[in-house]
Design a protein with these regions (language model features):
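Terminal recognition/anchoring or ligand-binding modules at protein termini
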Residues: 183, 188-189, 216-219, 226-227
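Surface-exposed, non-catalytic interaction/assembly patches
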Residues: 227-257
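Phosphate/NTP-binding elements of NTP-utilizing enzymes
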Residues: 283-319
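C-terminal extracytoplasmic interaction modules
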Residues: 97, 118-120, 220-222, 226-232
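Intein-associated homing endonuclease modules of the LAGLIDADG/DOD-type, together
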Residues: 1-208, 246-282
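Short secondary-structure boundary/capping segments
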Residues: 99, 237-238, 319
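Alpha-helical scaffold elements adjacent to nucleotide-binding pockets in ATP/GTP-utilizing enzyme cores
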Residues: 95, 187, 191, 220-221, ...
């Protein structure tokens, strides 16, 4: 992940030099952010971001129920409200039915035995989010409103994607999600990032599938280690043991041409930047302004500070 920022922008970090948490400017990390030769056991990065918490979001009435959308993005027909599933994964179909979609048509492929299910009303709902048109192929993607939905809704969306196009490596506590869609690859990473989990991505050249179909597109495999249960309905994809949270390291710095930036300040002191939601520190511009004002016009300004926003707001309410 890349973040454009000023050299004096501050970051809340874990400093491995001092084995403690700290707030440090970007330019202060550049001289000694790593030691040892790369790709050796002695190589290490010294500055790491804070652990990321889940993005709360809010419960929404979504055009397509999250699990069904995830299942369709994984195993659905691009131009119809169809899902393709094997007989052993019939639980996925039952889960879609529980979202309110009845089976309109059902067929079984004579060679592979894969079952085809068309659901009544699914295509109409998918068209509300700009997908599933019969006259042209759409770009499968996760609509923006789903990224800010509630935690439970985003979990259901993730479960639908993993039940269809995911695989579980239980010994490594890791899920792999595979797709040939470039945008869906990016959207999946963004979705996983809303839970504070980091991903790794690998690319694989087209190959012959287990069903005998020759692939024609590059396959993207996104891997991540969750720290809590994901509500998958396929039994073999239900993870029982979980990884501990891991910090993200600063692994490189590059000077770029100056560009327009904005100072941001939020109540909590830390906000998330970039598509991968990297924790970063508040702007200190307001503090500098108040200091300047008190120094230059002490006769017209007064400042009240407190360790609690409720106390501070209460004080000004009484005034």
């Amino acid at each position: 992940n890349y973040i454009d920022c000023h050299g004096t922008h501050e970051w809340p970090i874990y400093n491995r030099h001092k084995n403690r948490f700290d707030v440090i400017e970007t330019k202060q990390m550049i001289p000694d952010y790593q030691t040892g030769a790369e790709n050796t056991r002695k190589h290490r990065y010294h500055y790491q971001t804070l652990f990321k918490n889940f993005v709360d979001g809010e419960y929404k009435k979504l055009p397509v129920p999250p699990y069904t959308l995830g299942a369709w993005l994984g195993d659905g027909s691009n131009q119809d409200g169809l899902l393709y599933e094997s007989k052993q994964d019939r639980c996925i179909i039952e889960r879609v039915i529980s979202d309110g979609y009845s089976i309109k048509w059902h067929d079984v492929h004579k060679t592979t035995g894969v079952e085809h299910f068309r659901f009544d009303g699914l295509r109409f709902d998918l068209q509300k989010v700009g997908m599933c048109y019969s006259y042209h192929r759409c770009v499968k993607h996760i609509p923006e409103e789903y990224f800010t939905a509630s935690i439970s809704q985003r979990m259901e969306l993730l479960a639908g994607l993993l039940d269809t196009d995911g695989s579980l490596r239980a010994k490594e506590h890791r899920y792999d999600f595979s797709t040939t869609e470039f945008r869906l690859k990016d959207d999946f990473i963004t979705l996983v990032s809303t839970f504070g989990w980091r991903c790794s991505v690998s690319e694989h050249e087209p190959c012959l599938s287990s069903s005998g179909i020759q692939g024609r597109k590059v396959v993207y495999v996104i891997s991540f280690n969750p720290t809590c249960p994901i509500p998958c309905v396929v039994p073999r994809k239900q993870l029982k043991e979980f990884s501990k949270p891991r910090r993200v390291a600063f692994c490189g710095f590059e000077r770029i041409e100056p560009k327009q930036g904005n100072c941001i300040q939020v109540e909590g002191g830390v906000y998330c930047a970039g598509k991968r939601l990297i924790p970063t520190h508040n702007s200190t511009l307001c503090i500098f302004f108040i200091t300047w004002l008190m120094g230059n016009r002490p006769d017209v300004a007064s400042v009240m500070s407190g360790h609690s926003d409720k106390l501070t707001n209460g004080f000004y309410g009484e005034v």
